[in-house]
Amino acid sequence: MRRLNRKNNEALKKLNDRQRKVLYCIVREYIENKKPVSSQRVLEVSNIEFSSATIRNDMKKLEYLGYIYQPHTSAGRIPTDKGLRFYYEEMLKISKETSEADLAVETFKSMPLADPEKVLFLAGNLLARLTEGYVLIERPNTRDLKILRVMLIPVSEDYLIFSILTEFGVSKVTPIKTQERLNWEEIERQLNFLLRGRTVGEVLMGKIESLKGSGFLRLIESLIGETVERYLDAGLENLLKDETLTLEDIRNLLEEVKDQKFLESLVGEGITVRIGREIGRKKLEKFAVFSGKYFKGESPIGSVYLFTSKVTKYDRNHRVFEYILNRLSEYFTSTSRR
């Protein structure tokens, strides 16, 4: 990735300010209208005060350097992956110079403080809706969660409620039938002494000696050892409506994202954006993917992926993606301290 950026930077040094403006205009116009862009169109939608012949010469240079291409003779130009990468990098510079106050995104004030699953669902759907893309959000690994409290609540002579509360407000509850009268308050106290502060993984791996072979360990295993889908998704319908993608493209994407190692390879430091061929999969060259991690304090606990057509609004998508990652990190950091 760094090698690609280095090559792009070297090519950009060969462009003057006017040629950069022409390239920016071509990519923006193509993203908006999805039609090849002519030199005349560049003059119509920009403030570049040069002749059409000058713009055509600039476009020839941009084509030679691999930023745009001409699908057929007499047609306008279409940006290549390299041209789209230029546009994204330019928009990133602009977004850093503008105030965050103009980010028209819904806030997370309505987030239910005790239900991280709903928080992730809300975040995924919000991200998908605002970017018109397909979103995958990795759930925090249940095994890494610390147990905060165990509760035994008698509800009748024969039944009691067994509840385990973990970090982020994740709660597991089950009714159990009792055949004898015991001091449930004392048992609850002992369970809390043994389990509080330990991770779910430690319990499931049998690292608590005094629980080995007990009915409570089997109960805990059945309660918190249940399998959960690693990812939740949102926005597949957005790709189905995108005129630059075919059903075959979307089927290919859904097949590729089943590969856990592939998804992990997309994530780097901060927000990583891969466009077309940069993704490294032939079948995904029509896509762009944004990826990044969300945190609990300094520790990453999950990844977020946004897949769109590579003909997309990179400026908007980057800002919304960054916003969602920051809000998720704030939420999980604050709830872990409660």
From Swiss-Prot:
GO MF term (any one): DNA binding
Keyword vocabulary terms for this entry: Repressor, Stress response, Transcription, Transcription regulation
UniProt record, GO biological process: negative regulation of DNA-templated transcription
Keyword Transcription regulation: yes
Database matches in SUPFAM superfamilies: GAF domain-like (SSF55781), Winged helix' DNA-binding domain (SSF46785)
Pfam family, one: HrcA
PANTHER family: HEAT-INDUCIBLE TRANSCRIPTION REPRESSOR HRCA
Recorded family membership: Belongs to the HrcA family.
Biological role stated in the UniProt entry: Negative regulator of class I heat shock genes (grpE-dnaK-dnaJ and groELS operons). Prevents heat-shock induction of these operons.
Protein name: Heat-inducible transcription repressor HrcA
Species whose genome carries this gene: Thermotoga maritima (strain ATCC 43589 / DSM 3109 / JCM 10099 / NBRC 100826 / MSB8)
